[in-house]
Amino acid sequence: ENINKLNFQDHQGSHFAPHLVSKKIWNDVGGFSEEFNPGIASDPDFNMKLWKKGVRIFKGLNNFKVYHFGSITTRKKKNFTQNRGDRTFLKKWGMTTKFFKKHYLKSNTKYDGPLKNPKISFKFIIGLIGCKIRSIFTI
């Protein structure tokens, strides 16, 4: 009943899960990458693969609501080692997930059509250099 009172704008970026992607594009980019299992940073990695493929529409829909059960696949496992997905993403793509979402996906901004390549600004370059330095010191 209260769910209908929630009102968000369509936004740039992605809900991250679930995704609506054609089977051809899914197969072309290889779907989710196993190195991110059980899911930490698997969505940004998938979105980066889509970006590299030339996809520029990443749209979160206002009237689409998802309840995330939160770590349901790992919550009850004993001796579970948490995936270091953010580190894996940094090593794989040379930038943090936060940088990718901010500068490429423009996450959480109002949807206004297909995305463009990031604007190369002083702030962008400093942020990217910071990612590269962080990558060097990340194990």
Model-derived features: positions:
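Conserved donor NDP-sugar-binding/catalytic core segment of glycosyltransferases
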Residues: 1, 36, 56
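Active-site phosphate/pyrophosphate-handling residues
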Residues: 24, 45, 88
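Non-catalytic, C-terminal membrane-associated alpha-helical segments of glycosyltransferases
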Residues: 80-84, 99-139
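Acidic donor-binding loop at a coil-to-helix junction in glycosyltransferase catalytic cores
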Residues: 39-45
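Short, hydrophobic alpha-helical packing/hinge segments within bilobed ligand-binding/sensory domains
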Residues: 17, 46-47
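Active-site donor/metal-binding and catalytic loop motifs
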Residues: 37, 59-78, 88
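A recurrent flexible, glycine/aromatic-enriched loop bordering the glycosyltransferase active site
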Residues: 2-24, 28, 76
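Hydrophobic residues within well-ordered alpha-helices
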Residues: 50-51
